[in-house]
């Protein structure tokens, strides 16, 4: 399906997925940005958003950054 640029905001009150005017995904997660907790919640939210299993979403770049690149595998 391709690569997507994602901006993640951890420690949010409510988890959500939206699209910025620039076409990037803006994902707010409730989990803190420590020990990969926010990344795990990010993958779960994106899997639900795109309607695919979590195993088909791969974090390509930005493991410790708020700006990430994910890939949706076929």
From Swiss-Prot:
Domain of life: Bacteria
Residues in coiled coil: none
Single GO cellular component term: cytoplasm
HAMAP family per the UniProt record, alphabetical: UPF0235 (MF_00634)
Database matches in PANTHER family: UPF0235 PROTEIN C15ORF40
Entry's family note: Belongs to the UPF0235 family.
Protein name: UPF0235 protein tsr1994
């Amino acid at each position: 399906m391709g690569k997507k640029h994602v901006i993640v905001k951890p420690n949010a009150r409510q988890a959500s997925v939206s699209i910025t005017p620039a076409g990037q995904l803006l994902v707010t997660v409730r989990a803190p940005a420590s020990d990969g907790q926010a990344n795990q919640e990010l993958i779960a939210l994106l899997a639900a958003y795109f309607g695919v299993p979590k195993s088909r979403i791969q974090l390509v770049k930005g493991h410790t950054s708020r700006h990430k690149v994910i890939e949706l595998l076929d």
